[in-house]
């Protein structure tokens, strides 16, 4: 479509269409049935329009697969909501290793969902949780289970670990700073706030989200730590370190994958580590899978590593055995 002028400004308009058809040949006698069919056709056309936008097509005809996809999506949302309500999700914990001592310093809490015997990927159910707003309850569930794990390990004689708990932009956007539910849970579970690190993505710290500083300040004042996840994958990352009270940077796996073979990645990671040392910020390298990667990171002065080289995320009842085995090996 050609652009046109409004007030001397060129405007470009695009159209996306969804098409639905009624193919039954016989006449429709009932007015109620006419209205029912019309509503169905409109709904199908809206669904086709939505699918056309998702794939970037100018138009799409409705097909049954679109309806099946929506029904499956809605069923999964309902099942997730019930799973959160019934406390059916699990939390696994991935060890984070001190590079110099080869001992566990931290764990990252990672939520897992087994739906009718099958694991559902977090990449699938976390967006569903945000869309349905059940992410608030889910986040509180993860924090509560993390605190319970801390108390369990404490009873076994382990009281030195920090646990990272992820928080999304949506959770911050919906958060009520006048009733800090996260700190309430930590207090309720009788956990030292210094053992909890809230792990955020750069989107939480974006310039337009200045109100999030109040929440971060509350958490820091209580003694919690703040970790910035996936550092370097967004934009203007350096400004966040000046504006927000960040304790730890987590280097994204994409920087680590080829650090032992790509001199550019190695130089970039070393620069970030050196900068962090000057600022008094610790660095965690994520996605470490090879001994060669570990060697480069250790030589560069990285503080902590996380990844399958040491361990996958573990159920809570397997942590003690892992700690014993690691101590025996190192």
Place the predicted regions along the sequence by residue.
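Catalytic strand-loop-helix junctions within cyclic-nucleotide turnover domains
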Residues: 7-10, 15-41, 65-68, 96-101, ...
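Catalytic core regions of nucleotide second-messenger enzymes
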Residues: 1-15, 30, 53, 118, ...
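Catalytic core of bacterial c-di-GMP phosphodiesterases, primarily the EAL and HD-GYP domains
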Residues: 14, 21-25, 101-108, 134-212, ...
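Flexible, glycine/charge-rich interdomain/linker segments that couple
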Residues: 14, 21, 31-35, 51-75, ...
């Amino acid at each position: 479509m050609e652009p046109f002028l409004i007030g001397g400004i060129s405007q470009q308009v695009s159209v996306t269409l969804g098409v639905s058809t009624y193919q039954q040949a016989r006449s429709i006698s009932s007015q109620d049935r006419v209205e029912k069919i019309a509503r169905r056709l409109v709904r199908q056309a809206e669904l086709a329009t939505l699918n056309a936008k998702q794939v970037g097509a100018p138009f799409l005809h409705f097909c049954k697969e679109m309806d099946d996809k929506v029904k499956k999506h809605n069923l999964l949302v309902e099942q997730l909501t019930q799973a959160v309500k019934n406390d059916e999700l699990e939390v696994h914990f991935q060890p984070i290793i001190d590079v110099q001592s080869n001992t566990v310093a931290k764990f990252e809490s990672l939520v897992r969902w087994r739906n009718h015997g099958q694991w559902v990927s977090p990449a699938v159910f976390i967006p569903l949780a945000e869309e349905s707003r059940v992410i608030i309850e889910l986040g509180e569930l993860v924090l509560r289970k993390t605190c319970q794990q801390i108390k369990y390990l404490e009873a076994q004689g382990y009281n030195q670990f920090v646990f990272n708990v992820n928080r999304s932009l949506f959770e911050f956007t919906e958060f009520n700073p006048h009733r800090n539910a996260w700190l309430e849970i930590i207090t309720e579970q009788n956990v030292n706030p210094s053992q909890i690190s809230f792990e955020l993505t750069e989107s939480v710290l974006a310039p337009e989200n200045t109100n999030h500083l109040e929440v971060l300040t509350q958490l820091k004042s209580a003694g919690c730590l703040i970790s910035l996840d996936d550092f370097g994958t967004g934009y203007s990352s350096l400004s966040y370190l000046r504006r927000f009270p960040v304790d730890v940077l987590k280097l994204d796996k994409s920087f680590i994958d080829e650090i032992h073979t790509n001199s550019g990645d190695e130089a970039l990671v070393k620069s970030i580590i050196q900068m962090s040392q000057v600022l008094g910020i610790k660095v965690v390298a994520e996605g470490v899978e090879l001994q060669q990667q570990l060697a480069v990171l250790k030589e560069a002065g990285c503080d902590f590593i996380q990844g399958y080289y040491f361990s996958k995320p573990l159920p809570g009842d397997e942590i003690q055995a892992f700690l014993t085995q690691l101590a025996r090996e190192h």
